[in-house]
C-alpha cells in the first residue's frame, strides 16, 4: 500500500511531463486549400518549377524545396527521375513577416506604466515595466500543383502560423506538411490543422 502511494504521484508527474514535451513538438497552422484534383488520379511524379524571382537566389529556393519534399512524399508524390517527364509541376514558396507592436498601440489595455517600485537588489527605483518587445513573426508557405502536360492548376494550398520566434527549417517543413495534410481534399477555408515537427 505504501509503495503505491509513493509511485502514483511519480507516475502522474511523468505522464504530465511527457504530455508537455509532446505539446512542444506540435505546430498549429491555419490551412486554406483550393483546386479540382481529378477523381481517381494518383499523385505520381513531380518536378519543382521555379519562378524567375526564385531563380535569382538558388540557395534560398533549394532550402524551400528541401523543406517541401517530405510533405510531397507523405502526400504520395515521388521525384521524377533525370530522364523522366514529371506528371506534376510543383511551385513552392515561403515567407516570414516580422511585425512589432508598440506598447502604446492600445492605451486602454496597455500593460506598462510608470511608478515607484521596490526591488530587493536595487532599493526603490522608478521603472517603466512591461513587455515592450512584442515582436511577432507570421510564417506562411504555399504549394501549387500543376498538370505538367497542360499547365492547368490542379491544387493550391497555403498554411500559416505565427509566433514570437523567427522559426527554423523544421518549422518550415512542418508548415509544408500542414499544407498537404488533407491532399487532395479541399475544405472549409481557413481551418486549423495540427502537425508534428519533423
Name what the model sees in each region:
Residues 3-11:
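N-terminal export leaders
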Residues 19-69, 73-75, 92, 190-198:
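A structural "domain/chain start" motif
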Residues 22-36, 132-198:
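C-terminal/domain-edge helix-coil "capping" segments
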Residues 42-44, 75, 86-88, 137-142, ...:
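Envelope-exposed proteins and targeting segments
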Residues 50-60, 76-78, 131, 159-166:
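Second-shell loop/turn segments in exported
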Residues 55-66, 84, 136, 166-174:
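Soluble non-cytosolic domains of exported or imported proteins
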Residues 80-100, 194-198:
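Acidic helix-start/capping segments at beta-turn-to-alpha-helix junctions
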Residues 92-150, 186:
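Surface-exposed short loop/turn segments
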Amino acid at each position: 500500500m505504501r509503495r503505491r502511494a509513493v509511485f502514483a504521484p511519480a507516475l502522474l508527474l511523468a505522464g504530465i511531463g511527457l504530455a508537455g514535451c509532446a505539446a512542444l513538438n506540435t505546430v498549429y497552422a491555419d490551412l486554406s486549400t483550393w483546386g479540382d484534383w481529378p477523381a481517381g488520379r494518383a499523385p505520381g511524379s513531380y518536378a519543382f518549377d521555379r519562378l524567375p524571382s526564385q531563380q535569382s537566389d538558388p540557395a534560398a529556393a533549394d532550402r524551400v524545396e528541401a523543406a517541401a519534399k517530405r510533405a510531397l512524399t507523405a502526400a504520395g508524390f515521388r521525384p521524377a527521375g533525370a530522364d523522366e517527364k514529371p506528371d506534376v509541376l510543383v511551385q513552392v514558396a515561403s515567407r516570414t513577416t516580422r511585425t512589432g507592436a508598440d506598447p502604446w498601440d492600445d492605451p486602454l489595455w496597455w500593460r506598462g506604466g510608470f511608478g515607484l517600485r521596490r526591488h530587493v537588489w536595487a532599493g526603490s527605483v522608478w521603472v517603466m515595466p512591461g513587455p515592450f518587445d512584442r515582436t511577432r513573426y507570421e510564417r506562411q508557405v504555399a504549394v501549387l500543383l500543376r498538370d505538367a502536360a497542360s499547365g492547368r492548376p490542379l491544387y493550391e494550398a497555403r498554411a500559416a502560423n505565427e509566433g514570437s520566434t523567427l522559426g527554423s527549417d523544421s518549422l518550415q517543413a512542418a508548415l509544408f506538411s500542414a499544407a498537404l495534410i488533407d491532399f487532395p481534399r479541399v475544405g472549409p477555408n481557413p481551418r486549423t490543422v495540427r502537425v508534428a515537427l519533423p
